[in-house]
């Protein structure tokens, strides 16, 4: 089935506190992930919260990559949504690896076609 896009949603657990709380590290990781997947970057916006946590988005021509971190729990939620022929798992795998996730639960949603079919991807 052809779709307009693929949306990978990952729950990352057991990540390093310092990495999850480092806005520069998170931003570089997301920019690198987008480029590794072959995406064209349009905008980048990240915010550091007090006392901890980072949220951000990389807008790509093909859609977006987002993150919300909770360093105090060793947890990050990430979304990688791509349209066209880009594979969002390339970016999602790279991000999980860079954050050192000990546990990862992922689902993939085909977007733009009905009905919605949730595909459970993988758990580390």
From Swiss-Prot:
<feature type="active site" description="Proton acceptor; for processing activity">
    <location>
        <position position="68"/>
    </location>
</feature>
<keyword id="KW-0210">Decarboxylase</keyword>
<keyword id="KW-0068">Autocatalytic cleavage</keyword>
<dbReference type="GO" id="GO:0004014">
    <property type="term" value="F:adenosylmethionine decarboxylase activity"/>
</dbReference>
<keyword id="KW-0949">S-adenosyl-L-methionine</keyword>
<feature type="site" description="Cleavage (non-hydrolytic); by autolysis">
    <location>
        <begin position="62"/>
        <end position="63"/>
    </location>
</feature>
<keyword id="KW-0456">Lyase</keyword>
<protein>
    <recommendedName>
        <fullName>S-adenosylmethionine decarboxylase proenzyme</fullName>
        <ecNumber>4.1.1.50</ecNumber>
    </recommendedName>
</protein>
<dbReference type="GO" id="GO:0008295">
    <property type="term" value="P:spermidine biosynthetic process"/>
</dbReference>
<dbReference type="InterPro" id="IPR042284">
    <property type="entry name" value="AdoMetDC_N"/>
</dbReference>
<keyword id="KW-0865">Zymogen</keyword>
<comment type="subunit">
    <text>Heterotetramer of two alpha and two beta chains arranged as a dimer of alpha/beta heterodimers.</text>
</comment>
<keyword id="KW-0670">Pyruvate</keyword>
<dbReference type="InterPro" id="IPR003826">
    <property type="entry name" value="AdoMetDC_fam_prok"/>
</dbReference>
<feature type="active site" description="Schiff-base intermediate with substrate; via pyruvic acid">
    <location>
        <position position="63"/>
    </location>
</feature>
<keyword id="KW-0704">Schiff base</keyword>
<keyword id="KW-0620">Polyamine biosynthesis</keyword>
<dbReference type="InterPro" id="IPR042286">
    <property type="entry name" value="AdoMetDC_C"/>
</dbReference>
<feature type="active site" description="Proton donor; for catalytic activity">
    <location>
        <position position="83"/>
    </location>
</feature>
<feature type="modified residue" description="Pyruvic acid (Ser); by autocatalysis">
    <location>
        <position position="63"/>
    </location>
</feature>
<dbReference type="InterPro" id="IPR016067">
    <property type="entry name" value="S-AdoMet_deCO2ase_core"/>
</dbReference>
<dbReference type="GO" id="GO:0005829">
    <property type="term" value="C:cytosol"/>
</dbReference>
<keyword id="KW-0745">Spermidine biosynthesis</keyword>
<comment type="function">
    <text>Catalyzes the decarboxylation of S-adenosylmethionine to S-adenosylmethioninamine (dcAdoMet), the propylamine donor required for the synthesis of the polyamines spermine and spermidine from the diamine putrescine.</text>
</comment>
<dbReference type="Pfam" id="PF02675">
    <property type="entry name" value="AdoMet_dc"/>
</dbReference>
<comment type="similarity">
    <text>Belongs to the prokaryotic AdoMetDC family. Type 1 subfamily.</text>
</comment>
<dbReference type="InterPro" id="IPR017716">
    <property type="entry name" value="S-AdoMet_deCOase_pro-enz"/>
</dbReference>
<comment type="pathway">
    <text>Amine and polyamine biosynthesis; S-adenosylmethioninamine biosynthesis; S-adenosylmethioninamine from S-adenosyl-L-methionine: step 1/1.</text>
</comment>
């Amino acid at each position: 089935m052809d779709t307009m896009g693929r949306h990978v949603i990952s729950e990352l657990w057991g990540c390093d506190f310092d990495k999850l709380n480092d806005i520069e590290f998170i931003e570089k990781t997301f920019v690198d992930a987008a480029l590794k997947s072959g995406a064209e970057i349009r905008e980048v916006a990240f915010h550091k919260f007090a006392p901890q946590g980072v949220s951000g988005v990389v807008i790509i021509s093909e859609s977006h990559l987002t993150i919300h971190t909770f360093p105090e729990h060793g947890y990050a939620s990430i979304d990688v949504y791509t349209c066209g022929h880009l594979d969002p798992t390339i970016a999602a795998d790279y991000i999980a690896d860079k954050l050192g996730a000990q546990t990862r639960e992922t689902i993939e949603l085909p977007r733009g076609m009905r009905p919605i079919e949730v595909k459970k991807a993988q758990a580390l």
